[in-house]
Amino acid sequence: MAGSKACALFVVASLFGSGLAAAAEQPSAAQMMDDLMYGRGPVGGPFTLTDQTGKQRSDTDFRGKLMIVYFGYTYCPDVCPTDLMAITQALDALGPAAGEVQPVFITIDPERDTKVLADYVSAFHHSLVGLTGSLDEIRKVANSYKAFYVKVQDERSGDYSIDHAGVIYLMGRNGEYLGFMPPQTNPNRLTEVLRKSLAK
């Protein structure tokens, strides 16, 4: 998607500007963003996770619709709620056509998020599905989407935050990767991209 590459470079620069290093079990932020921008290898793939109601859901459940996939966490103070609200506004702007789009929020913090996931997703679009799983399951799905994230421990408080790329993924009706949009994409731009994708 035109314009996404330049913004994605800012995402990578921001991550490294914070002095972050990628977790050992995943590629670096720069490598994953390069793979996304330049189409190096597949993006997405099969998964089976648990939704906010406790039901197992797989990627095949959403076939026949466009799928918006967003990796984030409920304790995220700014980027996640901003992006999820933009997705909500874009879907509202689509009107009845929004029924052909399935938004999916995959938590990258299942240790804290699983119990509060239902309440969290209810604050956004009514069709938003929240997905959780074990740490290994989430990492596997994130890696298949080339979604970078790393836990950052605060030694003083004993708490942690999670740094992540906040990329908005768009998947086709058959689960194929269509492209990505950077964090804080304008809702009007999201609506435009969705309309064009639905028309194909």
What are these regions (language model features)?
Residues 59-81, 87:
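Short active-site neighborhood of thiol/selenol oxidoreductases, capturing the structured segment around
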Residues 19-23:
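Sec/Tat signal peptide C-region and signal peptidase I cleavage site
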Residues 7-18:
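Bacterial N-terminal signal peptides
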